[in-house]
Swiss-Prot record:
Active site positions: 330 (proton acceptor), 331 (proton acceptor)
Protein name: Histidinol dehydrogenase
Species this protein is from: Bordetella pertussis (strain Tohama I / ATCC BAA-589 / NCTC 13251)
Keyword ATP-binding: no
Needed co-factor(s): Zn(2+)
Swiss-Prot/TrEMBL keywords: Amino-acid biosynthesis, Histidine biosynthesis, Metal-binding, NAD, Oxidoreductase, Zinc
Binding site for substrate: 240, 262, 265, 331, 364, 418, 423
Biological processes, Gene Ontology terms: L-histidine biosynthetic process
GN (gene name): hisD
Listed EC numbers: 1.1.1.23
Length: 434
């Protein structure tokens, strides 16, 4: 079996082969969905008592009172102080860059006044309270804390509540340190669907939030789907994706490692290279074969590349851009000369990395833009997480007496046409001369 699929856009069956490669349907495991539904209903009904029970069952953490599940801020700062200097400096540098970028996204209230004195506008307000889910256990995701928490605080969210499971009572110090740096307000040692339920419905200990963001396992994803509508959610993310457009002049090892950077996430991750240079594709394939055995996650890489990876020969870079728009990838690298020229042709991508030195990994951690990106072709209609996800817009309408004379007649005419007499009368009552 080949290490990675090879496709040629000139082949008659190319479109079918590409569609099969891209096909991904999130597994709607009925047992997981039903388990999540049961946990949510129980947390909604029994509150803290259910939280304590599920935390003991799933995380083997037994406490007598739900208030003991809250992690004191002093512990976060102790975790921050205990980090190796280089790690702390890296976290703080990344946080500063993420904050600087997202401050440019902050929306502002605006108004304008018409000639008759009528004022119209839009008022921007932040959400009152947001919940942030951070996976726990052996894996540490401090970057997720930064990418989710900092935009919320830049948006002006007064209260940001983090939940993170602590299996066997073991807390992840780098996650707590990131919470201290990012401006999280409260943190609780809870996880799974029960944590989502606590954030959505509230308990005596955990306050209900307006929106839940952050990644999680299948149970967390199922729970987020079910509470959507009661609260807002960010998205239900699919497997990680990278698409690279290359002119054949970037070192092959660089491109191979860029493909690895997403393929190593899990077996369903997707890594694709588009290039008009057949010899370069062969170089990249050779680099993959040479570098892969030395990778710690080689087993995952092999499955991911064999099942969902591809090296695709295209006619030219214009065609590569057209294919990229059809794929609408989460991450798109344009590793070419004059990358701005090709970026102008891209309409659908979560994040675009321009030039040979802009590796996707830099965006994951510290470039500044958010790493929470649309997957599974949803970049056709959705955007990266940002400050705007934590702000709301309210329309402002202040009609002057003079304005009411004009607008009232228009509104009444339209309302009567729709058979809504009270609407019409409401407008007509304000007319000086009906």
């Amino acid at each position: 079996m080949a290490l990675i699929n090879r496709l040629d856009s000139r082949d008659p069956g190319f479109k079918t082969a590409l569609s099969q490669l891209l096909a991904f349907e999130a597994e709607q495991d009925e047992s997981i969905d039903q388990a999540a539904a049961g946990i949510l209903a129980d947390v909604r009904r029994r509150g803290d008592a259910a939280l304590l029970e599920y935390t003991q069952r799933f995380d083997r953490l037994a406490v007598d009172d739900a208030t003991a599940l809250e992690i004191p801020q002093a512990d976060w700062h102790a975790a921050l102080d205990s980090l190796p200097a280089a790690q702390r400096q890296a976290l703080e540098a990344a946080a500063a860059r993420v904050r600087a970028y997202h401050e440019r996204q902050r929306g502002e209230t605006w108004t304008y006044t018409e000639a008759d004195g009528t004022m119209l506008g839009q008022q921007i307000t932040a959400l009152d309270r947001v919940g942030l889910y951070v996976p726990g256990g052996k894996a540490a995701y401090p970057s997720s804390v930064l990418m989710n928490a900092i935009p919320a605080k830049v948006a002006g969210v007064p209260e940001l509540i983090m939940v993170t499971p602590t299996p066997d009572g073991v807390r992840n110090p780098i996650v707590l340190a990131a919470a201290a740096i990012a401006g999280v307000d409260r943190a609780f040692a809870i996880g799974g669907a029960q944590a989502v339920g606590a954030l959505a419905y509230g308990t005596a200990t955990v306050p209900a939030v307006d929106k839940i963001v952050g990644p999680g396992n299948a149970y967390v994803a199922a729970a987020k789907r079910r509470v959507f509508g009661t609260v807002g959610i960010d998205m239900i993310a699919g497997p990680s994706e990278i698409l690279v457009i290359c002119d054949g002049k970037t070192p092959a090892d660089w491109i191979a490692m860029d493909l690895f950077s997403q393929a190593e996430h899990d077996e369903l991750a997707q890594s694709i290279l588009l290039c008009p240079d057949a010899a370069f594709l062969a170089e990249v394939e050779a680099a993959i074969e040479r570098l892969l055995p030395g990778m710690p996650r080689a087993d995952i890489l092999r499955v991911s590349l064999a099942n969902r990876g591809a090296l695709i020969l295209v006619r030219d870079l214009e065609e590569a851009c057209a294919i990229a728009n059809d794929i609408a990838p989460e991450h798109l690298e344009i590793s070419t000369e004059q990358p701005q020229r090709w970026t102008a042709l891209i309409r659908h991508a979560g994040a675009i990395f321009m030039g040979r030195y802009s590796s996707e990994a830099l965006g994951d951690y510290c470039a500044g833009p958010n790493h929470v990106l649309p997957t599974s072709r949803t970049a056709r209609f959705s955007s990266p997480l940002g400050v705007y996800d934590f702000q709301k817009r309210s329309s402002l309408i202040q009609v002057s007496r003079e304005g009411a004379q004009t607008l009232g007649r228009i509104a009444a005419e339209l309302a009567l046409g729709e058979g809504l007499q009270a609407h019409a009368a409401s407008a007509q009552y304000r007319l000086d001369q009906p």
